[in-house]
Amino acid sequence: MKNFWKKTSLLLVTTAMTLSAPLLAWALEHDIVILHTNDIHCGVNDNIGFAGLAQLKKDALAQTPNVALVDAGDAIQGAPLGKLSTGEAVVNIMNAVGYDFCIPGNHEFDYGMARFLELVPQQQAGYYSANFMDLRTKKQVLPGYKLMEFEDKKVAFVGATTPEALTTSTPTFFQDAQGKYIYSFCEDTSGKKLYKQLQKNINAARKQGADFVFIVGHLGMDGTTPQWSSENIAKHTTGVDGIIDGHSHERYERVVQNKKGKDVLLAQTGTKLKTVGQLVITPAGKLETKLITAANGKDAEVQKVIAREMDIYAPLLAQPVGEALVQVHSNDPKTGERIVRNHGCALGDFVADAYKAVLDCDIVLVNGGSIRNELQAGVLTYNDILEAFPFGNMCTVLEASGQQVLDALEMGAMSYPEESGGFMQVAGLSYTIDSSVPSSVMLDEKGNFVKVAGARRVVDVMVDGKPLDVNKIYSVGGNGYILKSAGDGMIMFKGAKLLQDAKISDADAIMEYIQNHLNAKISDKYANAYGDGRITIK
């Protein structure tokens, strides 16, 4: 027997875990090795990179013929290569790497539903999701699971996509022209619909002879909707041996108990290929797992594919935009942790100021989730701008009452100290979050704002030095994802009068601000990583 697990000494490995399974009535000749990734976000050359991942798969195949490579979502969005090719370049690279199973995360839908459905047949591994439903037909949009045979044994992978996709991608992508939802992810406030739908697919896979079943889920743990977390799915289902997870950008391997008290392994690898997960089913039927942080080289053929795809856009992305005299932070320089989703920061101030200058409005609200990378000191290129603002969101200005603004700030602060993509960076106003006050924001089953049921966490809201008037009408600028499409559940602006609609994209607004308002130089006005004090937390 060959044991791949014993052959990994040349790999740098961070953690390891073994989960004993019941002794099986059969024995494999070779290990089954499952390599898994999540939340790559177009990081084709980041960290291990796709070429390193391909080498890991090649090395695994040299030790055992039983190898699968699976992805848990959010692969095709998050950087210029994905934006400019609307996902196709990343799919092409994934095909070259040799994936066997993929699921859509929330950001696979960011180029629109029509575009995602165009990409589905191009993904050679296939896209799978047991809970992605068409409400018009009452059927799954995609296959729910895939059976793979290794020797004479079967392993099933069941896809699961977070219902948070309805609010963390653009909500209108899941609606018809009248604003009625035509797609669902089996969402409700209890989680029962999701558990039932996944259990249905798990049972079907077992009925087809699956010896092991793994959910490959874009679900997450910390900072995600509790009833849709991977841990709660494990606790409310049976017949699952492990959950390969994504969405929350965490790195972990842990064991929880299922509905009947049996162990279920959970694993997630972080983001941008900082690690690759490796799950091994041994000939004795045990599960062993590690997180790998380096590969033994790069696969040359995949490197060529990456270079070919990137060369298409290289001249455009190399165009200079301006210069930053200081690094403009969205991360904490002391820890490296992202703060744009739960704290004031320099880049949040900068983006909000840019929108305010270009859109000429009273107030700007910018969701922290729309800001994806820092701006480094030095010459700035178009690539740098798109790395920070890869969504292509169109800027919008509307009329909103002070009450609507207050509700948006409250919803953005509801998860603090945990991150929230809807956390508001601002211009034209300042506010304080009283973290001693529990959030009383109420949401509907899709995660949309309903009301504030009790005391408010957000206090001392000032507009140009004066207290916010809840009855006054303000011109509010930002991206259409929040203001027009109710992204991150910000439905309080629905029906508001539009003053400017799709005037300019977020990236173009940033470039206009740099070139026409800052004389092509970002000054030390934005040197303080934690911002200029617009957001206070107590």
Tell where the protein language model's regions lie, with residue ranges:
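Bacterial N-terminal signal peptides that target proteins for export
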Residues: 2-12
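Gram-negative bacterial Sec-dependent N-terminal signal peptides
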Residues: 12-18
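Acidic, metal/ion-coordinating pockets
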Residues: 26-298, 342-354, 364, 414-416, ...
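Catalytic centers of hydrolytic enzymes
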Residues: 28-31, 37, 43, 62, ...
